[in-house]
């Protein structure tokens, strides 16, 4: 378990922003401690009204969702002093530029409509416009064209919700997908040794330039690693991330 947070303080005006290489919360530098929540199989039993208080008590201050949440879920997060990192899930796993261009247009429309409704919600912290486009598809569609499409989504979001941090959740196989308009660099990485993480973090900061780095997924293969192994790596990962900036 992470060291406990102070007692929750409900702040209706709470807002996550980007200042240079760092995130700020309500104007002060803030180190996000995020846990992924979902996606869940159709028959899974999960209850956010019970899970979110547990997430907060475990020492996390934010949850990454793999969808654009409705008002009820955003309200529940805010009530538990959790920041929501929303992910726009659309058909980016196929050729959305030549074979199915309507997917991208639908994605733009869905994102702008959702942001119009929820951009000022105190529980919303940031938006990811996609997650891990398969490397073979990215190469097939041409990397710079994929980057341009992702950048279009980000600029749409920034136009509708100025100041709301937006990015794309990348992974090491497609380092070249780094939309220029992104407010921060987001990466999903699974490195099972602290030394490997320590060696890769400087690479991420190099890719990010003057933007913050946010590890949007991190952990171990739970089928092969015990809870003890996970509990050992997590504090080390937090320490290394802080040291890397």
Predicted regions and their residues:
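Extracellular glycoside hydrolase catalytic/binding regions
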Residues: 139, 145-244
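Hydrophobic alpha-helical segments, principally membrane-spanning helices and signal/leader peptides
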Residues: 11-12, 202
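A short, acidic/glycine-rich surface segment
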Residues: 19-22, 195-197
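Short, positively charged and aromatic/hydrophobic N-terminal segments
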Residues: 1-3, 10
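Active-site mouth of glycoside hydrolases
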Residues: 10, 17-18, 24-185
């Amino acid at each position: 378990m992470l060291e406990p947070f102070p007692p929750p303080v409900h702040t209706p005006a709470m807002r996550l922003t980007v200042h240079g290489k760092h995130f700020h919360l309500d104007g002060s530098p803030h180190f996000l401690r995020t846990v992924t929540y979902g996606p869940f199989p159709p028959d899974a039993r999960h209850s956010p009204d019970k899970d979110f208080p547990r997430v907060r008590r475990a020492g996390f201050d934010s949850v990454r969702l793999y969808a654009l949440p409705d008002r009820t879920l955003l309200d529940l997060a805010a009530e538990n002093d959790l920041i929501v990192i929303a992910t726009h899930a659309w058909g980016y796993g196929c050729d959305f530029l030549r074979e199915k261009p309507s997917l991208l247009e639908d994605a733009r429309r869905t994102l702008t409509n959702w942001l119009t409704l929820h951009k000022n919600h105190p529980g919303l912290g940031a938006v990811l416009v996609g997650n891990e486009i398969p490397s073979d598809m990215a190469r097939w569609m041409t990397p710079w064209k994929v980057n341009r499409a992702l950048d279009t989504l980000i600029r749409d979001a920034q136009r509708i919700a100025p100041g709301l941090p937006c990015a794309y959740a990348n992974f090491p196989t497609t380092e070249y997908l780094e939309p220029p308009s992104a407010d921060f660099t987001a990466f999903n990485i699974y490195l099972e040794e602290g030394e490997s993480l320590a060696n890769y973090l400087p690479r991420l900061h190099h890719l990010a330039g003057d933007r913050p780095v946010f590890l949007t997924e991190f952990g171990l293969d739970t089928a092969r690693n015990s809870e003890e192994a996970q509990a050992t790596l997590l504090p080390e990962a937090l320490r290394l991330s802080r040291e890397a900036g």
